[in-house]
């Protein structure tokens, strides 16, 4: 009965509104444009309507809306639309928070937070971030612990590697000491030479315990060696270890004993500025290191540093050098360094002197830069003692600060100059470094007392190099050897002659009157000859200008008949009377092109002492084709490059020809 009464009462309330007509605003609520005060009654009436309706009827309508007729459903739908519009209007105006919240929930719009909800939201966010930060801290702490553990492991591994490296260095040093300490040469900047032996490695306090050295093993224990003092004394000790690392031992090393000599260890003078460099000796056999006491007569190094005695037994299985390879090459200390090398044979073991195969000196010469450089040593003056460096670059200015000019003699530095910092060399410019007390045009600076003047070397065997701070050779200059050529001296088209006068002791049978005709000195004879040439020559006589080389070449092709009437240029006039000279001048052929000397071997030559009356006189032999070293003579040489104050010309150096040592 209840559902029916409920339906009837609802029809009574809704029936006054016809179909398609909007219900009254007092019953259904105010439209969008109505004032706000009329919304509340409609809401209260609708609330009363819903509250007055029994619960069972409303639940039935919600659960079974199909039971309602279409007209009623349409009215309810329109009513709900009006309510939604009213709620939207209320939310937009903001006068009713409840309407706004309902509209936000219905329309799906996020609700606006107030101050309390905002604080709560922020607190939640802070708590969330705090938890995340705490988790990140825990993770970072774990990673830190893992990294610390890895660091400890790496440090331990590093210590192990350092220990192994130190052990390896000690073993290498022992191998060096066992194989090549005897004869190891140290050369310092001052030129001093020291020979290092195994005694140098030992501390002076350890010599009292020399009796306790074991007779087997490496020769002396590692704990007896002061490695720090060795490193300070020889800083370049381990720099040449790669030289010995390539040589593998084919046989196990035999047991050896190092016996220290009673003469004592080598004395060392330690200086702070002393730089020592190692010289690498070519090892013929690293598996055995037998040594005998060197002979002091054939080994000057042993005299310098004291004889060092070592004993050992040669290896029977090694035959690296034969007896023909055991040679002695003695060198002076000023030029070359004597180096001791061992040559082993199956029958004997000797310490001999051998020269270097790769290194000729302990000083290792820097290598030339293969890429080249724009810097070049333009000139090295041996007379003025200066070095000139030019910058061949077109646009690059080079800083020469720290660059070194070195002069090497036999690959050993004898002179060195370092450019000061800030020395700039512009492109296409040069810089000249002068030595002290050498130039005649430069003003000399006073030299401090007790200090040697700085001078560059001028020997022809000196090599000048320019080295950068990294040790690379940028330029190299060496004077070309000067070869004296006899043909180059007499190419100035001047009258040249070598006047030969046999000395008095070589001709004891010469007539006294003829000796009076000879000139008293070469100077007078040359002066007379010069005066005679200024006069007008007689008929049929020509003055010829020739050179020594042309005369020598022509003398080889002439026939004996052509040299019959050829007279000497100067000696014939001095030794023969004036009448005979005129007779000979008339007999000279006019077609003679060159004046050549008389060849003594020619049987048909003209007798110089035979005049028109048939009288036989002394024959003067003038030899110009070759120098007769068995005949005492006085020779005068002439050229136009120099002249004395007496008007006498002389050569700056003797003429050297290829026929000097040949006898024709």
UniProtKB/Swiss-Prot annotation:
The lineage of its organism: Eukaryota, Metazoa, Chordata, Craniata, Vertebrata. The gene is Lmntd2. Residues 245-260, 312-325 have a biased composition (Polar residues). Keywords: Coiled coil. Residues 362-481 form the LTD domain. Residues 533-547 have a biased composition (Basic residues). Residues 286-298 have a biased composition (Low complexity). Residues 118-169 form a coiled coil. This is Lamin tail domain-containing protein 2. It comes from Mus musculus. The keyword Iron does not apply. GO terms for biological process: positive regulation of mRNA splicing, via spliceosome. Residues 1-40, 245-272, 286-329, 504-563 are annotated as: Disordered. It comes from the Eukaryota.
